UniProtKB/Swiss-Prot annotation:
It is a single-pass type III membrane protein. This is Non-structural glycoprotein 4. The chain crosses the membrane at residues 29-51. Pfam families: Rota_NSP4. Keywords: Activation of host autophagy by virus, Calcium, Enterotoxin, Glycoprotein, Host endoplasmic reticulum, Host membrane, Host-virus interaction, Ion channel, Ion transport, Membrane, Metal-binding, Secreted, Signal-anchor, Toxin, Transmembrane, Transmembrane helix, Transport, Viral ion channel, Virulence. It comes from Rotavirus A (strain RVA/Human/United Kingdom/ST3/1975/G4P2A[6]). The lineage of its organism: Viruses, Riboviria, Orthornavirae, Duplornaviricota, Resentoviricetes.
Amino acid sequence: MDKLADLNYTLSVITSMNDTLHSIIEDPGMAYFPYIASVLTVLFTLHKASIPTMKIALKASKCSYKVIKYCVVTIINTLLKLAGYKEQVTTKDEIEQQMDRIVKEMRRQLEMIDKLTTREIEQIELLKRIHDNLITRPVNVIDMSMEFNQKNIKTLDEWESRKNPYEPSEVTASM
């Protein structure tokens, strides 16, 4: 464990990796060498960082699988961020939590839609009743003979003088 965290050991491993790469690739004009060296350096650093972390985590915790899974997911997400990706790796637990949250939100929205639909149906029924009350219905022909002022009307034949008493007659007035 001490050897894993020792800086001199780490530097000697990096130096030996670089020497090995230089011996494998003897062409000095190799264009991809810096990229290969960078990737190998990152992988080596992750290896050096993850092994002690995993060992400490396994000794310190009772639930080793979850800790290892969390460490691996964190390392992969860090690599993805370093590479410039916006996506992230998630564990099943996180996915299940998100799914539960989404299902709860969908249930809440369905209840809201149900309440709103019920209210809208009630409003439509109320508007229908109001409309039915406001509609003018055709009325049958009213018998005007039953009105008060026309009950005792006499016809021209029924009058004694055969003259309408309500017609204006000639009036002479003095000046």
